[in-house]
């Protein structure tokens, strides 16, 4: 007789649920609105332009990881650290914007997806790779 696979391991391979995606998008939009208002008083965040690119929410909706990227030149790690310092304030402002049973605990991480995409783009346009991708007359 075969054992049924546990739902936790099955859920881990499926990815986030529709509920998690919807909650993450709500938090991302509300967080962007709070930041746009300019009410954050941290000296490292005043006059700093950045984007909240993605918010991933845990299955129980108690934890949210917010990925941030500076617009233009800037240190993404320093930006994430500055936002972590004011996360209590941001969480309070979010609770006024979005209604959840429990407001998720916020963690901020630098978004490296743009850097990875740029690295892949550079690799694809490098002379070594482009010679492999160009059509050659091998039929002769």
UniProtKB/Swiss-Prot annotation:
It is found in: Cytoplasm. Keywords: Cytoplasm, Ribosome biogenesis. Monomer. Binds 30S ribosomal subunits, but not 50S ribosomal subunits or 70S ribosomes. Its main location: cytoplasm. One of its GO terms (cellular component) is cytosol. SUPFAM superfamilies: Ribosome-binding factor A, RbfA (SSF89919). Residues 1-13 have a biased composition (Basic residues). It comes from the Bacteria. One of several proteins that assist in the late maturation steps of the functional core of the 30S ribosomal subunit. Associates with free 30S ribosomal subunits (but not with 30S subunits that are part of 70S ribosomes or polysomes). Required for efficient processing of 16S rRNA. May interact with the 5'-terminal helix region of 16S rRNA. The gene is rbfA. It holds the Pfam family RBFA. One of its GO terms (molecular function) is ribosomal small subunit binding. GO terms for biological process: maturation of SSU-rRNA. Disulfide bonds: none annotated. Residues 1-22 are annotated as: Disordered. Coiled coil: none annotated. The keyword Cytoplasm applies. InterPro entries: KH_dom-like_a/b, RbfA, RbfA_dom_sf. Belongs to the RbfA family. This is Ribosome-binding factor A.
């Amino acid at each position: 007789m075969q054992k049924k696979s546990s739902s936790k391991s099955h859920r881990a391979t499926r990815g986030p649920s529709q509920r998690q995606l919807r909650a993450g998008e709500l938090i991302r939009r509300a967080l962007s609105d709070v930041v746009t208002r300019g009410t954050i008083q941290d000296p490292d965040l005043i006059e700093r332009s950045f984007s909240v690119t993605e918010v991933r929410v845990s299955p129980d909706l108690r934890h949210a990881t917010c990925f941030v990227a500076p617009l233009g030149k800037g240190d993404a790690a320093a930006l994430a650290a500055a936002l972590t310092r004011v996360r209590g304030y941001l969480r309070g402002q979010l609770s006024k914007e979005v209604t959840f049973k429990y407001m998720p605990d916020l963690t901020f991480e630098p978004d490296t997806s743009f850097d990875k995409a740029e690295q892949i783009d550079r690799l694809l346009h490098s002379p070594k790779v482009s010679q492999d991708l160009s059509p050659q007359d091998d039929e002769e």
